[in-house]
Amino acid sequence: MRFDVITLFPDFFTTPLNSGLLGRAFNKNIAKVNLVNPRNYTTDKYKKVDDESYGGGVGMVLKPEPIFAAVESLPTLSKREVILLTPQGKRMHQGLFRELATDYEQLILICGHYEGIDERVQYLVSREVSLGDFVLTGGEIPALALINGVVRLLPGTVGKAESLECESFESGLLDYPQYTRPANFRGWKVPEVLLSGHHAEIARWRYQQQLQRTKSRRPDLLKNDDN
């Protein structure tokens, strides 16, 4: 999987992409990230990437020329998707990550900034994606979230496939409670069923906990087909 990230702040990605599970995945060449600064594709001496909005308004708008030039400079793999990170896009969910990890080999992520991005960038974009119903200073954090969510689903990133299958949202439910040693901490005890060694009973208990937790915390998931 190849990620090409169009961003004015490439340094923002350095530490997260070299740490933990993501860092190991990139070191093993399971995925590759290419950071592209559109400022390098400007044609004026000031390297200007933004300008005032036609019709007036507060804030600056990212110009289309550097974005187009940056994207068009990239190699084109056969299964490619160009994604704009914007609060106006569809919200990320586990089903989206599965689709991107399975169906594509190149994801180009365009990080918006300032007041917005020139609407004509739509002619480049396959889809718009949002981290949630809130506004951030730019698309870098959503891009990191998307990269993280997709890379961990690629074969070889997570040691055991069943680790992924049992997680929140993979079954459409939240995850069950997890416990480790000690069995008794300040009077709070691990449920007896988890100490029993009875695998069928443990599986039944975990599923019941998933249902209860989902009904209590995220009842919308029980009605939502997206996940």
From Swiss-Prot:
GO terms for molecular function: tRNA (guanine(37)-N1)-methyltransferase activity. InterPro entries: Alpha/beta_knot_MTases, tRNA_m1G_MeTrfase_C_sf, tRNA_m1G_MeTrfase_TrmD, tRNA_m1G_MTases_N, tRNA_MeTrfase_TRMD/TRM10. It comes from the Bacteria. S-adenosyl-L-methionine binds at G112, L131, G132, D133, F134, V135, L136. Its EC number is 2.1.1.228. Keywords: Cytoplasm, Methyltransferase, S-adenosyl-L-methionine, Transferase, tRNA processing. It is an enzyme of class 2 (transferase). It catalyses: guanosine(37) in tRNA + S-adenosyl-L-methionine = N(1)-methylguanosine(37) in tRNA + S-adenosyl-L-homocysteine + H(+). It is found in: Cytoplasm. GO terms for cellular component: cytosol. GO terms for biological process: tRNA N1-guanine methylation. Belongs to the RNA methyltransferase TrmD family. Homodimer. Specifically methylates guanosine-37 in various tRNAs. NCBIfam families: PRK00026.1 (NF000648), trmD (TIGR00088). This is tRNA (guanine-N(1)-)-methyltransferase. It comes from Trichodesmium erythraeum (strain IMS101). The gene is trmD.
